[in-house]
Amino acid sequence: MKLLTALSELISIFLFTTIFIFLARKVAIKIGLVDKPNFRKRHQGVIPLVGGISVFAGICFMFGLSDYYIPHLSLYLICAGVLVFVGAMDDRFDISVKIRAVVQAVIAVVMMVIAKLHLGSLGYIFGPWELVLGPFGYFLTLFAVWAAINAFNMVDGIDGLLGGLSSVSFAAMGLILWFDGQTSLAMWCFAMIAAILPYIMLNLGILGRRYKVFMGDAGSTLIGFTVIWLLLETTQGKTHSISPVTALWIIAIPLMDMVAIMYRRLRKGMSPFSPDRQHIHHLVMRAGFTSRQAFVLITLAAAILAGVGVTAEYSHFVPEWVMLVLFLLAFFLYGYCIKRAWKVARFIKRVKRRLRRQRKNRPNLTK
């Protein structure tokens, strides 16, 4: 595929999604598909929850525009459409967690039975021996679908973060697939980014605060499901493009945040789904950073971790078990910092004060 053709298609997806999201936000306000401020949500006014619907519309436009061969594309669109619909209903009417979990489980089973997408192997994470899962792989796949959806849902706490982290994951997968010759799957990843960008622009208020939109559960569910579908498509089979352990690096920050916060909640005797303000973005902001700075820092950290995974995938000289050990070390470092968040926050504030004093005491140079 020519690069110019690919760029023109991505620009078309971006423009279509931009127009769609402006139209969708007007409809959302009329039908009450909006987010209202409460004790946990500090935004002002009602915000349309149309980010996810717009991303899905952009992806449908992409597949209608092109003739890429994507295995089981129709099944993906049906499954994703159901999840987006249920997510939108939850955004509007607040559906119970149990109903959403059942729907996600049914979709996962359909994906495994019809598309034959499931975890059959975790690769060579124990040295020269491949870890083949057998029938247990189906149960692990069910958990992986649920985990991916909830991991991306949990990071949707400050402006731009869900869009930034998901774009990092899709960019990492897209680069690996593009240079591996899997151009159709790569374009799917890049199209997701093109469809997410208009949401990021409006969510951050780049085009004006009055046009602000949120992703909503429909969007976080769509993104998590698409990520796990692509990872199952590309990490399994004899000729897989991505090693299973690399998938951990590609979704590192959402995965680490979900595991860490659920562990803390369970230790306190709380439900793992109970809301709190202990996510990574809350802790970074508690250290003295603004919402925008936290978005940039966390997205940059995700890009660095994903970059490590992509580099290792291409180098071929780093064994998979070494990459797993390095990931676990990164996870334990993350857990250590989160557990001692107040110390980390105090250290960062001290450094920031010292830098401010140095700038203030620096003599002005005149010609």
Swiss-Prot record:
The keyword Cell membrane applies. It is found in: Cell inner membrane. Its cofactor is Mg(2+); Mn(2+). GO terms for molecular function: glycosyltransferase activity; magnesium ion binding; manganese ion binding; phosphotransferase activity, for other substituted phosphate groups; UDP-N-acetylglucosamine-undecaprenyl-phosphate N-acetylglucosaminephosphotransferase activity. Pathway: Bacterial outer membrane biogenesis; LPS O-antigen biosynthesis; Bacterial outer membrane biogenesis; enterobacterial common antigen biosynthesis. It comes from the Bacteria. Belongs to the glycosyltransferase 4 family. WecA subfamily. Keywords: Cell inner membrane, Cell membrane, Glycosyltransferase, Lipopolysaccharide biosynthesis, Magnesium, Manganese, Membrane, Transferase, Transmembrane, Transmembrane helix. The lineage of its organism: Bacteria, Pseudomonadati, Pseudomonadota, Gammaproteobacteria, Enterobacterales. Pfam families: Glycos_transf_4. Catalyzes the transfer of the GlcNAc-1-phosphate moiety from UDP-GlcNAc onto the carrier lipid undecaprenyl phosphate (C55-P), yielding GlcNAc-pyrophosphoryl-undecaprenyl (GlcNAc-PP-C55). This is Undecaprenyl-phosphate alpha-N-acetylglucosaminyl 1-phosphate transferase. It is a multi-pass membrane protein. GO terms for biological process: cell wall macromolecule biosynthetic process; cell wall organization; enterobacterial common antigen biosynthetic process; lipopolysaccharide biosynthetic process; O antigen biosynthetic process. It is an enzyme of class 2 (transferase). GO terms for cellular component: Gram-negative-bacterium-type cell wall; plasma membrane. The keyword Transmembrane applies. It comes from Salmonella typhi. Its EC number is 2.7.8.33. NCBIfam families: ECA_wecA. It catalyses: di-trans,octa-cis-undecaprenyl phosphate + UDP-N-acetyl-alpha-D-glucosamine = N-acetyl-alpha-D-glucosaminyl-di-trans,octa-cis-undecaprenyl diphosphate + UMP. The chain crosses the membrane at residues 3-23, 45-65, 69-89, 129-149, 158-178, 187-207, 213-233, 242-262, 318-338.
